Curated annotation (Swiss-Prot):
GO terms for cellular component: cytoplasm. It comes from Pseudomonas fluorescens (strain Pf0-1). SUPFAM superfamilies: YrdC/RibB (SSF55821). Belongs to the SUA5 family. TsaC subfamily. This is Threonylcarbamoyl-AMP synthase. Keywords: ATP-binding, Cytoplasm, Nucleotide-binding, Nucleotidyltransferase, Transferase, tRNA processing. It comes from the Bacteria. Coiled coil: none annotated. Its EC number is 2.7.7.87.
Length: 185
């Protein structure tokens, strides 16, 4: 992957604890380092979102989630791999390998391997990221940079320019253990 200077700048900011806004497949997202509690707390405060709800982790390839899959049946891994990269988010058991500020009150965590080039480039530099829609709780997700700036002026550390991926709807969310759809696309 060839990382643009903008993506490299965003990666530096994330490593320093920043909360950024960036384009994804369907809507703008907010993201930060999932291991940085202060950054996640800021992101949740910006969105006015409860920590109990949990957050999605996005990556550039399935290997970035290998630490979670050690005890998974191979058919689970194959099922996820067959849908990635793409607009599929899977709820998987986190086995207490992630902090509560990422998982909320759930026994599962939401994982996605993005097919958006900028998101993949960014994750290739920093690893998995928090990815949540760029909107205050209860408001429509931002579909333009202007809306991101209207919602979050002065609250995010960086807005990574770029185009959305062309999808109409956010990703489908399914439970890996049951196959049940939790959120349709």
């Amino acid at each position: 992957m060839v990382n643009s200077w903008r993506v490299q700048q965003a990666a530096r900011e994330i490593r320093a604890g920043a909360v950024i806004a960036y384009p994804t497949e369907a809507v703008w997202g907010l993201g930060c380092d999932p291991w940085n509690e202060e950054a996640v707390d800021r992101l949740l405060a910006i969105k006015n979102r409860s920590v109990d709800k949990g957050l999605i982790l996005v990556a550039d390839n399935i290997r970035q989630f290998d630490f979670l899959f050690e005890d998974f049946p191979q058919d689970w891994i194959d099922r996820m791999a067959s849908t990635w990269p793409g607009p599929n988010t899977w709820l998987v058991p986190h086995q207490n390998l992630l902090p509560e500020w990422v998982t909320g009150v759930h026994d599962t965590v939401a994982l996605r391997v993005s097919d958006h080039p900028q998101v993949r480039d960014l994750c290739s530099l920093v690893g998995p990221l928090i990815s949540t829609s760029a909107n205050p709780q209860g408001r429509p997700a931002a579909r333009t940079r202007l809306r991101v700036e209207q919602y979050f002026r002065g609250q995010v550390d960086l807005v990574l320019g770029g185009a959305l991926g062309g999808r109409k709807n956010p990703s489908l969310i399914r439970d890996l253990a049951t196959g049940n759809i939790v959120r349709p696309a």
